[in-house]
Amino acid sequence: MMRARVPLLLLGILFLASLSASFAISLREHNESQDNPFYFSSDNSWQTLFKNQYGHIRVLQSFDQHSERLQNLEDYRLVEFMSKPETLLLPQQADAEFLLVVRSGSALLALVKPGGTIIYSLKQQDTLKIPAGTIFFLINPQNNEDLRIIKLAMTVNNPQIQDFFLSSTEAQQSYLYGFRKDILDASFNSPIEEINRLLFAEEGRQEGVIVNIGSDLIQELSRHAKSSSRKSLDHNSLDISNEWGNLTDIVYNSLDVLLTYVEIKEGGLFVPHYNSKAIVILVVEEGVAKVELVGPKREKESLELETYRADVSEGDVFVIPAAYPVAIKAISNVNFTSFGINANNNYRILLTGKGGPTGKEDNIISAGINPDVLGLMFPGSGEDVQKLFNNQNLSHFVNGSYHKNAQPQPHEQEQQKQQKGRKGAFVY
């Protein structure tokens, strides 16, 4: 997925040529999070759908309501689930496909299908797809560790996603209760009084959709659980790894989603890159990082570029549109999970560093563009530009402190002055 096509290379170079060291001062900068259409703060972007002493369910603000620039994500939502030890999320189904990742802890996930119930044993970094309309329930089998899960929800009924619970609790009503008496007694072949007593009576009703359960039930379900058919983002399946970071990719072709897990060491840099087709939803798990994204100015008639910056930490979300160059620098050890929408036939294009996972291949810029063309694109000679692009010996993750504490040299200051007022990408 890392091999680029020439038009994509040229697009990336147009963006790259608009950057000077530290991104040229001609670019309008967005350092304030409230002015950044791609940034979702953990403090005020999550809405709590349900909460009790056993856990909570939260949903991220809808992308299209957050910014008109995220309209393409109107059919997607992020859901966070947390439960205490020895608890059960009651059976439900939804009018959406789910792609879940276990952020911490372990889980038993039961999928109730026409051919029978399948119970999966999931551990940290395991992922699984829940098909739309499938009845499922979720258990935290541990006795001393919370379970945390992040889910990408993909609706099949616009515009909202609806969870349907079989049973009534103090928090919500069973959807069975919506049917008329004559439909219920005929369907169950039982008097309505018995149906009301067994299914709808307030006595014995659970307080909420997350409930405490006993160890006997956990042991019984665990005996029938299997770990096959699930995929993992753990260290045993790394695609990219060096001293500064690790990366794992999993593509769910049926969902057209690229699932990625990234770890960056403190001081490390995920070099400037972009995705040719995928819109990436980045969810920070742990640590702190600085994200810099370069894209068109918001005014449609403008040809200038903007730099969107954000300091992200646990629970924050950042959206990276397709073809927008981005760089991520770790302030502390940081890790995050990302969901790439439109993953099929997507390429991750590195703008600097070596292009291959082993670091032995030439980077795609110098390998894909003739030195004579490079000489026409940049002020330096084609050979010198090619050498510059080949200076970095690592792929994806590098030491991010090479220019730390360095002051701009006179020629750098002059270059910044010359860049001021220039236009950026073509917008049409």
Curated annotation (Swiss-Prot):
General function of this protein: Major seed storage protein.
GO molecular function terms attached to this record: nutrient reservoir activity
Quaternary structure and partners: Homotrimer.
InterPro entries: Cupin_1, RmlC-like_jellyroll, RmlC_Cupin_sf, Seed_Storage-Functional
Identification of the protein by name: Phaseolin
Domain called Cupin type-1: residue spans: 38-196, 231-386
Underlying gene: PHA
Compositional bias of kind Basic residues: 419-428
Pfam families: Cupin_1 (PF00190)
